[in-house]
């Protein structure tokens, strides 16, 4: 085996992964709960970029409902963001699964 070749391949993979990680912020996913009463937009880094709450979801006598709706929407968005990030990183690594990367 040519060690120099392996080193070049490792450098290419490292660069591809770094580029893919930078692009995670450009990935956009959305999720909702309560039939659209709560909507969450998130990027591939699992950072919330927008959260909207329909006034119909705000009932001072039922705070728990709003909390549940927000929790459900955020969890759904996180799942979508992780899936999108995993797909992006998989493309960058040629399908090689690397533990601890994107997700």
UniProtKB/Swiss-Prot annotation:
GO terms for molecular function: DNA binding. It is found in: Cytoplasm, Nucleoid. The keyword Cytoplasm applies. It comes from the Bacteria. It holds the Pfam family YbaB_DNA_bd. Transmembrane segments: none annotated. GO terms for cellular component: bacterial nucleoid; cytosol. Keywords: Cytoplasm, DNA-binding. Binds to DNA and alters its conformation. May be involved in regulation of gene expression, nucleoid organization and DNA protection. NCBIfam families: DNA_YbaB_EbfC (TIGR00103). Belongs to the YbaB/EbfC family. PANTHER family: NUCLEOID-ASSOCIATED PROTEIN YBAB (PTHR33449:SF1). Homodimer. This is Nucleoid-associated protein A2cp1_3777. It comes from Anaeromyxobacter dehalogenans (strain 2CP-1 / ATCC BAA-258).
